[in-house]
Amino acid sequence: KNEFIRF
């Protein structure tokens, strides 16, 4: 899981 784009 990639949690980079969290807006």
Curated annotation (Swiss-Prot):
GO biological process: neuropeptide signaling pathway
Keywords: Amidation, Neuropeptide, Secreted
GO CC terms in record: extracellular region
Tissues of expression: Found in the nerve cords and a variety of ganglia particularly in the anterior regions.
Subcellular location: Secreted
Chain positions found as Phenylalanine amide: F7
Function description: Potent modulator of inhibitory motorneurons. Reduces the input resistance and blocks slow oscillatory potentials in these cells.
Listed name of the protein: FMRFamide-like neuropeptide AF1
